[in-house]
């Protein structure tokens, strides 16, 4: 339907927080959000939370409960995915974000599963070039949050592409901090993976330096703690640092 096209466009350029809430929904968790139930279409571009209202009104999400908070009794809604049809609608939507680079996207997934870093770099840069600007939320977006919007969208795509082989978890506590993404194999014959994303800081001379920082962070903060607790040995855990500078990506 036409509202799906609108929902897709709004979610693609949505903030990192909103994409994280989508990840939870796809993983069949409930989320708690605040929005105005009266959708005013003119507000959709300005007020990000209006998308939740649109998703509820379209029947994709259902309200499990409402809690009224504060002096103004602001409504906070617990939302969950309505049914499997919604899961497939979201899956198709996330895939469509990378349609302009779909062949490269599939090749990237293959390279990631095979641990081929050279091919990962090649395809990831092609994907970023072809699709990066679609994640743009407009003129007011900082250079820093722009790549973040892109790679969180990328994680959502990853979530649906490899879900048969891996449980994809993101932004959770493990060791001494919060990792970006871990891929936990459903069959222990496969390697587990930790992905850390970093936007290049001005004081970093090269993207290689940014990659090294990402990899060091995985080690120092012991992000593999959760995987080891699940009985996955260290030699079966791959670490990848993704460094971003505008549309350029380096993976190491």
Label the predicted regions.
Residues 226-252:
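Domain-level recognition of nuclease-like catalytic cores that cleave nucleotide substrates
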Residues 1-222, 249-252:
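Extended alpha-helical interface modules used as scaffolds for assembling large macromolecular complexes
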């Amino acid at each position: 339907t036409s509202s799906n096209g609108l929902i897709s466009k709004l979610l693609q350029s949505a903030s990192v927080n909103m994409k994280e809430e989508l990840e939870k929904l796809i993983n069949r968790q409930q989320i708690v959000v605040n929005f105005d139930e009266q959708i005013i279409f003119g507000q959709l571009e300005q007020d990000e939370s209006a998308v939740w209202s649109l998703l509820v009104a379209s029947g994709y999400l259902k309200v499990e409960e409402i809690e009224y908070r504060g002096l103004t009794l602001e409504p906070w809604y617990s939302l969950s995915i309505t049914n499997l049809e919604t899961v497939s609608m979201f899956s198709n939507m996330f895939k469509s974000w990378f349609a302009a680079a779909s062949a490269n996207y599939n090749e990237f997934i293959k390279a990631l599963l095979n641990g081929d870093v050279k091919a990962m770099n090649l395809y990831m840069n092609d994907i970023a070039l072809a699709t990066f600007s679609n994640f743009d939320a407009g003129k007011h977006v900082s250079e820093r949050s722009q790549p973040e919007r892109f790679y969180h969208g990328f994680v959502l795509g990853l979530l649906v592409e490899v879900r048969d082989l891996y449980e994809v978890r993101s932004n959770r506590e493990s060791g001494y901090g919060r990792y970006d993404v871990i891929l936990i194999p459903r069959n222990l014959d496969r390697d587990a993976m930790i992905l850390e994303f970093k936007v290049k800081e001005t004081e970093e001379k090269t993207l290689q330096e940014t990659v090294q920082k990402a990899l060091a962070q995985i080690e120092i903060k012991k992000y593999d703690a959760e995987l080891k607790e699940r009985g996955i040995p260290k030699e079966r855990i791959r670490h990848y640092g993704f460094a971003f500078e505008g549309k350029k990506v380096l993976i190491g």
